[in-house]
Amino acid sequence: MTVFIAPNRKANGFNLSTMRRYTVHQQSELQTARDSGYARVILHTLTDHELPPPESAFILDRVFIRKEEFTEAEEDAELEDDDFGLEISKVTGRPAFLQDPIYEPSSRYMWLLQLNASELEDIGPRYEGIFEDGIGHLILDKQARKAPQGAEAGYFFIQFT
């Protein structure tokens, strides 16, 4: 599974008007962002070699996410709020929202991953401004494992202040 976004790079960062197409600050914006096509989650098989992207493509460095257990302090902070989790990058757990909480209305989907922009920016300068200092959310389609290669496997959106 790979997440593709179309952030539209400009000289000093990313184009905010393009990023807004996959930004969801309130529940009523969710379906429009999902339908925009500016963020796609695609199912595919692993290969032993990469496909070369077009030369014009802006490709970020590949990042692998390693799951680590919460520290005791993080676990306490995660459970402190009845509604929201920590604003850190994490796999599963409870999502944190910087604006209104966003709920997937269908039980077919599950919240899978949260990426904090400041932690991505620590990887390298090409990530600076990628989520407008916000948080990216990956929602997984639980039926994706039955889908053919190239099918949508969920959706992705960002929130920022």
Specify the residue positions occupied by each region the protein language model found.
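Preference for intrinsically disordered or flexible, low-complexity segments
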Residues: 1-161
